[in-house]
Amino acid sequence: MESLYETLRTLPLSVSIPLTTSIIIILSIVTNVVKQLWFPNPHRPPVVFHIFPFIGSTVQYGIDPYAFFFDCRDKYGDCFTFILLGKSTTVFLGPKGNDFILNGKHADLNAEDVYGKLTTPVFGEEVVYDCSNARFMDQKRLLKLGLTTDSLRCYIPKFVKEVEDYVKNSPYFKGDTGIVNITEVMAEITIYTASGSLLGNEVRSMFDSTFATLYRHLDDGFQPINFVMPGLPLPQNFRRNHARKVMEKLFSDIISKRRETGNQGDETDMIWMLMNAQYKDGEPLPDHHAARMLIAILMGGQHNTAVSGAWLLLNLAHKPHLVQELYEEQTQVLGSPQEPLTWENLQKLTLNGQVIKETLRLHSPIHSILRQVKSPMRVPGTEWVVPPSHTLLSSPGTMARSEEFFPRPSEWDPHRWDKIEPLVKTAEDGQTVDYGFGVMSKSVSSPYLPFGAGRHRCVGENYAYAQLGAIVATFIRLVHIEQPDPKAPLPAPDYSSMFSRPMNPAEIRWRRRETVE
């Protein structure tokens, strides 16, 4: 070793520095490989074999997470650890894994240490992941109060009108037929329907000007790099921070103006609900909390609905016979000429609901749910212990793509729900729990968990079904859709994006119906 050191000293820096660096890299690689092959830790889940210490399995996971999970499950079982950019990430698949992670005690694991870096610069401080878990659960309770069935009844006509106006006035739908990028179309439709229903007429009217730009700049804050380094001096982060401050002031001004007028009328939007809300301890909800929660509810669900809607319509375009079935179902349920779509008759559109469920099964926008381990956690039935240095990863979508639960799992077939609905229902064992925002099923054994489970289950589930259901029903009533190239396959998922959207070109051909009853 001394002779090597002396040799390196005699070399010029232009040679010794690259050579020394290469030696260090080679030694670290050799050490890493030897440790995995000959000195595995029997008290830890098996580690996915990798060559480069820091990179680990990052590339394979990033290219196709589901393929990576299934391949690792075949080799290592349901529980294994892989290296994600230097971080030991323990995956636990299946019902036991979902229960271990999603129903885990907050003292043992949490979500805020993972997601707080990403969401706090977008939503603001003191809300969501930038407050105590008890306060966050109370905030979810308040948001849920604005998503009742009575509220949804009021929202359905707004959803319908937004889609009708969009198809009538958007430059994407000029003439009687054309080709559109459905990802862009659904992004616009979902933000218009969400803002108009949840945030009221003032906000919706601003979406054609100032608000749309602010929203886009805030949206740019959802970049994967911000999971690790949210404060980087990047142009999009400067725009994100400015947009959040301006949007918060806009919401606060709307709240102040409404307090002055006090004229709610028939409006049932979330602003009216939050401006009069109280925390469980009796403290009135501060206006700046309300403003930041409004940003969170607008941003939090719009991406999922937009991506799911795009996948849904792309799949329908590949199966025109289902488009016709959906149209005929509306005629049968709503009559001809059709009566207005309401919450009650939306529930009667069975196939309309099934295309949503099948899309969420096969194209769940979130493939990985992460939690930071806070205290050592023993994996049930093993001697393995997951240490606090690890991140836990749950992937309910792997069950939804498993042959064990869904025959021909890679096939998009809404009619499968004609037969398997009871299977999903019976997976709930009757156990319930209240994390602070309402009683819910504790079971995580269902193979269909598109909205997650446990204390961080999405409170907007019913709203999402209603919004997407009304959008799809109205869209199909107005236009017929098909794929531009009958031989082209469905676009592949873009797993480099935050929400697994379809890769471009994600296009459909539309044709305006001759008569819209």
Swiss-Prot record:
GO cellular component, one term: endoplasmic reticulum membrane
GO MF term list: heme binding; iron ion binding; monooxygenase activity; oxidoreductase activity, acting on paired donors, with incorporation or reduction of molecular oxygen
Gene3D superfamilies with a match to the protein in the record: Cytochrome P450
Consequence of gene loss (knockout): Decreases the amounts of 4,4-dimethylergosta-8,14,24(28)-trienol, the product of the Fusarium sterol 14-alpha demethylases. Leads to reduced ability to produce conidia. Results in increased sensitivity to tebuconazole, diniconazole, difenoconazole, flutriafol and prochloraz, but not to triadimefon and propiconazole. Affects ergosterol production in the presence of ebuconazole or triadimefon. Reduces virulence on host wheat ears. Host-induced gene silencing of the 3 genes encoding sterol C14-alpha-demethylase leads to strong resistance of host to Fusarium species.
Residues at which heme binds: 458
Cofactors (names): heme
Domain of life (superkingdom): Eukaryota
Pathway: Steroid metabolism; ergosterol biosynthesis
Keyword Lipid biosynthesis set for record: no
Classification via InterPro entries: CYP450_sterol_14alpha_dmase, Cyt_P450, Cyt_P450_CS, Cyt_P450_E_grp-IV, Cyt_P450_sf
CDD domains cross-referenced by the UniProt entry: CYP51-like (cd11042)
Binding, lanosterol: 115
Compartments reported by the entry: Endoplasmic reticulum membrane
Disulfide bonds: none
Membrane topology recorded in Swiss-Prot or TrEMBL: Single-pass membrane protein
Annotated positions binding itraconazole: 300
One annotated GO biological process: sterol biosynthetic process
Main location: endoplasmic reticulum
Keyword tags: Endoplasmic reticulum, Heme, Iron, Membrane, Metal-binding, Monooxygenase, Oxidoreductase, Transmembrane, Transmembrane helix
Additional free-text comment from the UniProt record: In Fusarium, the biosynthesis pathway of the sterol precursors leading to the prevalent sterol ergosterol differs from yeast. The ringsystem of lanosterol in S.cerevisiae is firstly demethylised in three enzymatic steps leading to the intermediate zymosterol and secondly a methyl group is added to zymosterol by the sterol 24-C-methyltransferase to form fecosterol. In Fusarium, lanosterol is firstly transmethylated by the sterol 24-C-methyltransferase leading to the intermediate eburicol and secondly demethylated in three steps to form fecosterol.
Function: Together with cyp51A and cyp51B, encodes the sterol 14alpha-demethylase that plays a critical role in the third module of ergosterol biosynthesis pathway, being ergosterol the major sterol component in fungal membranes that participates in a variety of functions. Cyp51C does not seem to encode an active sterol 14-alpha-demethylase, but can impact indirectly on sterol 14alpha-demethylation, and is required for full virulence on host wheat ears, but not on Arabidopsis floral tissue or the fruits of apple and tomato.
The protein's name in its UniProt record: Sterol 14-alpha demethylase CYP51C
Species name: Gibberella zeae (strain ATCC MYA-4620 / CBS 123657 / FGSC 9075 / NRRL 31084 / PH-1) (Wheat head blight fungus)
Designated gene of the protein: CYP51C
